[in-house]
Curated annotation (Swiss-Prot):
Function description: Retroviral proteases have roles in the processing of the primary translation products and the maturation of the viral particle. Endogenous Pro proteins may have kept, lost or modified their original function during evolution.
Family from the record: Belongs to the peptidase A2 family. HERV class-II K(HML-2) subfamily.
Protein name in the entry: Endogenous retrovirus group K member 113 Pro protein
Lineage: Eukaryota, Metazoa, Chordata, Craniata, Vertebrata
Enzyme class, broadest EC rank: hydrolase
A Pfam family recorded for this sequence: RVP
Keywords assigned: Aspartyl protease, Autocatalytic cleavage, ERV, Hydrolase, Protease, Transposable element
A Gene Ontology biological process term: proteolysis
Amino acid sequence: WASQVSENRPVCKAIIQGKQFEGLVDTGADVSIIALNQWPKNWPKQKAVTGLVGIGTASEVYQSTEILHCLGPDNQESTVQPMITSIPLNLWGRDLLQQWGAEITMPAPLYSPTSQKIMTKMGYIPGKGLGKNEDGIKIPVEAKINQKREGIGYPF
């Protein structure tokens, strides 16, 4: 599962105890929270010992009495003991995201800012190909080391 930051919220599905839930990926949440209206009535819950901070005023906060089996969006095995309260959508917190191997990456640009300015002045449009009809290569050519130990490309 992957999601680019955009106007759309990063939402993914998880299966908890065989039941599918959809939730918002929330790296700012310490724990995962299931919306009270989505919590199955036959699943046990108890009043939470601690409150929730950062989601506004939650009057009733519960927690699952059991540690539950969970499958992440790409079938990652995990366990969770979620909090339960009246929120509009489920939140997948760091307790699950860490078990799923979630990462936040910000790729470095392929070219330096100086080379980008030079290319732009020469008429290059990002995302378009090189050449008169903008149909040429769109990604840089990678240098390959010559493993035969002869000719161009052989590291001395």
